[in-house]
Design a protein with these regions (language model features):
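Conserved MFS/SLC helix-loop-helix module at the cytosolic interface between two early adjacent transmembrane helices
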Residues: 68-107
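Cytoplasmic membrane-interface "Motif A"-like loop-to-helix N-cap segments
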Residues: 79-90, 298-312
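Cytoplasmic helix-loop-helix junction between adjacent transmembrane helices
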Residues: 112-152
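C-terminal transmembrane helical hairpin of 12-TM major facilitator-type secondary transporters
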Residues: 302-352
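Helix-breaking motifs and short loop linkers at transmembrane-helix boundaries and internal kinks
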Residues: 49, 81, 96, 102-108, ...
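Extracytoplasmic gate region of multi-pass secondary transporters
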Residues: 37-38, 231-291, 346, 350, ...
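Helix-loop-helix hairpin linking two adjacent transmembrane segments in secondary transporters
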Residues: 147-200
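Helix-to-loop junctions at the C-terminal end of transmembrane segments
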Residues: 70-81, 290-302, 388
Length: 434
């Protein structure tokens, strides 16, 4: 009797929860390492005597490496497993994060940020493959929503931590410090993770049985799906629909994320510490909404686009109100409203991606979608830097660009059929074979 009670207590915490938590930490440190530069940027620009366009290129060059290696990184995870690829990648980018603090040359800093982006490019495909391996299909939307909270917490923590460290020790120290935790985390993943849930020493029969339904579905469709290749995936309209949705969405997201601190300092006249705090607020609000987006998309599975579309549109309207506000208090309010609905839409979107792509090419397929976002991440900060410089320091045109882009993302989402998961997925109810 006591043994049975102990077994029940132990079974409440599942291996997949640990996997998700560690994946969450990986995403968190990836965002911390890439986002501290947005707070440090005015000081880097002053130290290295950079124009707004040069600062924009410094923000964008990360995404050049990130986009370039996104698909190859996903393919590596499909071939070698997410454990090895993720552990090596996080150690790689953490080393180059710390090296950033030792650079005194602008060209060399561009090179470091580019190589840093190559390492981070391996994470998305590996992380989504890990979720596909360990989570039953009915929980993947929630899992991706929880994982995506780092899209909000990362910039929030980075803003506050970077402002505090820069204020006390200067901008170089923040990069040196941020690189250390990732190395430790990478070693943990290498020694403690398994690609196949069946190989994990703490995996229970009870938890494996929850995956059996997905496994059996995959076996029943094995013959039909055996010929599915990554090349054939490129012929699927749904891949390109999702890729273009994510491209336009990320034009807005990375413009909002990259230039918000500079906007608050240069246009609204806030201090460094106030900028850190107010830059963090939208992402703290978004932490709630991104989980809510994943949860709601699970509730309307098969019609996930109807969670994405209205929230993307509302976010664009909030950005318009933010642009038109003369009061700093209202600017802060509207930026929080914009972030809430932006991240709610984001949580719903990745539930659709994970549920739609064939399991055996999950990492490569999701990396392709994310690659388009990376291309947007390269274009957006650089273009906005040029627009700011060309307009004599005005941010008006950048807001118009962000509003237009997120509305276009919603319009593209309208072209997806209501039963997309059922009609387009080759095996949407499967988990990955390790």
């Amino acid at each position: 009797m006591n043994k049975q009670l102990q077994m029940k207590k132990k079974s409440k915490w599942k291996v997949r929860y640990t996997v998700l938590f560690v994946l969450w930490l990986c995403w968190l440190f990836s965002f911390l390492d890439r986002m501290v530069i947005t707070i440090a940027l005015p000081y880097i620009g002053e130290d290295l005597n950079l124009t707004a366009t040069a600062q924009g290129l410094l923000l964008s060059i990360f995404f050049a490496g990130y986009a370039l290696f996104q698909i190859p990184g996903g393919m590596l995870s499909d071939k070698f497993g997410f454990r090895r690829v993720m552990s090596i990648a996080i150690v790689w980018w953490s080393i180059f994060t710390s090296l950033t603090g030792f650079i005194f040359s602008y060209p060399l800093m561009l090179l470091i940020r580019f190589v840093f982006g190559l390492g981070e490019a391996c994470l998305p495909g590996a992380a989504y493959k890990g979720i596909a391996n360990y989570f039953p299909s009915k929980q993947r939307g929630t899992a991706t929503g929880i994982q995506s909270t780092v899209n909000t917490l990362g910039p929030a923590i980075a803003a506050i931590a970077a402002a505090a460290i820069i204020g006390a020790f200067g901008w170089r120290t923040v990069f040196i410090v941020m690189g250390i935790p990732g190395i430790i985390l990478g070693l943990y993943i290498w020694f403690r993770f398994k690609d196949n849930p069946k190989d994990h020493p703490k995996m229970t029969k009870e938890e494996l049985s929850e995956l059996d339904e997905d496994i059996q579905f995959e076996k029943s469709n094995e013959e039909k799906n055996s010929g599915v290749s990554f090349k054939e995936l490129f012929r699927k309209p749904i891949l390109w629909q999702m890729a273009f949705i994510w491209f336009f969405f990320d034009i807005t997201f990375w413009g909002f994320t990259s230039w918000l601190p500079s906007y608050l300092i240069n246009v609204r006249g806030l201090s460094l510490m106030d900028t850190g705090i107010f830059s963090a607020l939208p992402y703290l609000v978004g932490t709630v909404s991104i989980v809510l987006g994943g949860y709601l998309s699970d509730k309307v599975k098969g019609k996930r686009k109807w969670v994405f579309i209205p929230n993307a549109v509302i976010s664009g309207l909030a950005l318009l109100l933010m642009l038109q506000s003369s009061s700093t208090a209202m600017v802060i309010t509207y930026q929080c409203v914009a972030a809430f609905f932006m991240f709610l839409a984001q949580g719903a979107f990745w539930g659709l991606v994970v549920d739609t792509l064939p399991a055996k090419i999950m990492a490569a397929g999701s990396s392709t979608v994310n690659c388009f976002g990376s291309i947007a991440g390269f274009i957006s900060p650089l273009l906005m830097g040029y627009m700011i410089e060309s307009s004599g320091g005005s941010y008006n045109s950048t807001f118009i660009l962000m509003i237009a882009a997120i509305i276009v993302a919603a319009i593209v989402a309208l072209t997806i059929g209501n039963n997309t998961e059922k009609e387009n997925s080759l095996n949407s109810e499967t988990i990955v074979e390790a």
